[in-house]
Amino acid sequence: MLKERTHHANDPEESGSIRISRVKTYKTVAGPLFLRSGCSPSFVEGLKADEGLRTFARLPEREHQLLLSIAQQPENKVTLAYDASGNIVGQVSLAPLDHWWQDIGNAYEIAVVVSSSWRKLGIAHHLLSFALEFESVEESLIVGLGFSWHWDYEELGMSRFRYREMIARLFAAHGFAEYLTSEPNIRMDPANILVARLGSHIDGESMNCFFQRLLQSETLPGL
C-alpha cells in the first residue's frame, strides 16, 4: 500500500536553490518504508546504509559514501527507500551517461540496488516507478548497464544468467528493452546486459547517436 505526499525542501548544498522532493510511504510485511525522490546530499548524509546494501562498494559504509558522492553532483537524481530508523534499504540513481555514450543528448545511466535483507518485497519495482516520474522522462534516453561482477547471485543460490533474466524482467516492466551492443564492458561477460528506455518524445539526433554507439564496433555479439 502506498500513500503519497509532496513537498518542497530547501537544499543548503545548492546555494539557496530549492530542490523538489516527493515522499511516499510503502507498507511491507517487514515494516513500513519511505520512498523519497530528489534526495539532497545533506539528506543522504543523515541516513545510513542497511547491512545488506553492498552491491557496488562491498561494505555498507562505503556504499553510503558512494551514494553521497552521487547526490553531491547537481545533475544527478537520487531516489531512496529507507526505514523509520534511517536505514537506506534501496536506491535508484540517474546520472548523465559518459565515456562510450557521452555525446548523446539528455541521456542518463540508471542504477538500482536493494538490500539483500529486503528482497522479494516489490521494493525495486516501486523504486523504479517512483524514480521515473520526473517531468522530462519522455524526452530522455535512460540506459541500464548490468555487470555480473556486481551481482550477488551466488548468495541467492542462482546462476548469473538467471540473475540476468531477473534484471531483464524488472526493467521490461518499466518500459525498457534489451539491446545488443559492442560496448567493451558489456562484452566482458555474456551474462552482462544493456537495457534502455527511449522516451516517446526523444529527439531524432539522440536516438540516431544511441543506435550508432550500439553498433560502434565492427563485431556485434549475437549476430
Regions found by a protein language model. Give the residues of each.
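Terminal substrate-recognition subdomain of acyl/acetyltransferases
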Residues: M1-G46, S140-L223
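Conserved GNAT-fold acetyl-CoA-binding loop/helix
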Residues: S42-L66
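Surface-exposed cleft-lining segments at the edges of enzyme active sites
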Residues: G52-L53, Y108, V113-W118, E154
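A conserved beta-strand-loop-helix scaffold within acyl/acetyltransferase catalytic domains
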Residues: A57-Y108, V112
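Short, high-confidence coil segments that cap the C-terminus of an alpha-helix
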Residues: N76, V137-S140
